[in-house]
């Protein structure tokens, strides 16, 4: 059994609760509860590392909880890292939750950034959510960039969603309001003044979108640099940095269009990366723009795949695939696995590409077809 973040209280703070029940009562009730648990599983208490307080909370005996609670066990964790408060929440026991919170109870820190209120949302107890919202601390965004409203919506908790909607409507930060009104100058000013936001949160993505739409290069560069924190970007250009971003929530295709307006051309490696992003976004306009600036659609990657191969793999639309067919010298070129575009289209069940390639005169062949043909001529 371990503890964390123990709340320091004046010694007398707990005294009134330790006197709430006679010692004999505490001993007899615990003995009875432990015996009841042992009948189901004799090793449960030991294996789960339950403290007496865990047992009392699990049994929903508030009088016993009040008698046992002290600053040493209030945030003790069991074998599954659950504190008494977490058990009370999962047990849907609002009165015990209120008592433990008043005594300084918390749930153990976790890798997802979730707090007590997330558990209350999970069990769909709106009254408990309302209490924890007003009386406990929690992060605005979890590890995945979700707000409490997002979490409730994902869990299908309609009444709780409405509660958060009302709260959020009245408690938006200046940065959120500036983003909503698409006031780019206010957004920049607030960020310069230190307004905090998670770059990979819903708000962060909205700011990114606003920066791209306004073509504000300084804000775009700031956001790109923060997106790539921890990566060695060295002396790379902004366009080279963007080529390293792989986040479906950022409209990279639109961003590249903004950045290449004044670019006369690209080196092969960068051009290939940008072309692949355009292809996987199924953005014909960007592919055409890159092609007009000298990006070679036939440039092969490490797997020997051309732009046409990637378009088929991404199951792109008819217009983009047709464009690449028309701008590919050898539509029967095989990648290193031996597949040519038609073979790849068939193996990926890409009917559009299959139809267009057959109309263009493509044939399906594998790496060793020519060898087999030659051997056949010699009677093997």
Swiss-Prot record:
It holds the Pfam family Ank_2. The keyword Repeat applies. The keyword Repeat applies. Keywords: ANK repeat, Repeat. InterPro entries: Ankyrin_rpt, Ankyrin_rpt-contain_sf, Multifunctional_ANK_Repeat. ANK repeats lie at residues 48-76, 80-109, 112-143, 170-199, 203-233, 239-268, 270-299, 303-333, 337-366. PANTHER family: ANKYRIN REPEAT-CONTAINING, PROTEIN HOS4. This is Putative ankyrin repeat protein RF_1306. It comes from Rickettsia felis (strain ATCC VR-1525 / URRWXCal2).
């Amino acid at each position: 059994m371990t503890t964390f973040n123990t709340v320091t209280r004046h010694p007398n703070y707990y005294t009134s609760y330790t006197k709430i029940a006679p010692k004999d009562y505490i001993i007899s009730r615990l003995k009875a509860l432990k015996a009841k648990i042992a009948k189901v599983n004799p090793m449960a208490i030991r294996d789960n590392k339950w403290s007496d307080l865990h047992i009392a909370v699990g049994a929903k005996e508030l009088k016993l909880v009040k008698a046992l609670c002290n600053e040493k066990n209030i945030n003790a964790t069991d074998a599954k890292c659950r504190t008494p408060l977490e058990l009370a929440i999962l047990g849907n026991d609002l009165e015990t939750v209120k008592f433990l919170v008043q005594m300084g109870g918390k749930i153990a820190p976790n890798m997802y950034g979730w707090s007590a209120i997330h558990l209350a949302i999970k069990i769909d107890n709106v009254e408990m959510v309302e209490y924890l919202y007003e009386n406990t601390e929690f992060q605005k965004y979890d590890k995945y960039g979700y707000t409490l409203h997002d979490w409730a919506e994902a869990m299908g908790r309609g009444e709780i969603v409405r509660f958060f909607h009302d709260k959020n409507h009245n408690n938006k930060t200046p940065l959120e309001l500036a983003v909503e009104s698409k006031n780019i100058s206010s957004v920049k000013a607030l960020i310069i003044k230190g307004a905090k936001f998670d770059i990979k949160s819903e708000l962060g993505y909205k700011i990114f979108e606003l920066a791209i739409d306004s073509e504000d290069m300084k804000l775009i560069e700031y956001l790109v640099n923060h997106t790539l924190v921890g990566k060695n970007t060295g002396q790379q250009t902004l366009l080279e940095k963007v080529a390293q971003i792989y986040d479906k929530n950022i409209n990279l295709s639109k961003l590249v269009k903004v950045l290449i307006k004044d670019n006369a051309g690209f080196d092969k490696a960068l051009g290939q990366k940008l072309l692949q992003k355009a292809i996987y976004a199924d953005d014909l306009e960007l592919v055409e723009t890159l092609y007009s600036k000298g990006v070679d659609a036939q440039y092969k990657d490490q797997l020997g795949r051309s732009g046409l191969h990637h378009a088929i793999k991404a199951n792109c639309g008819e217009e983009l695939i047709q464009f690449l067919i028309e701008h590919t010298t050898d539509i029967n070129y095989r990648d290193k696995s031996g597949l040519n575009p038609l073979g790849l289209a068939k193996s990926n069940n890409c009917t559009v590409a299959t139809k267009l390639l057959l109309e263009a005169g493509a044939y399906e062949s594998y790496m060793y077809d020519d060898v087999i043909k030659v051997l056949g001529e010699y009677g093997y």
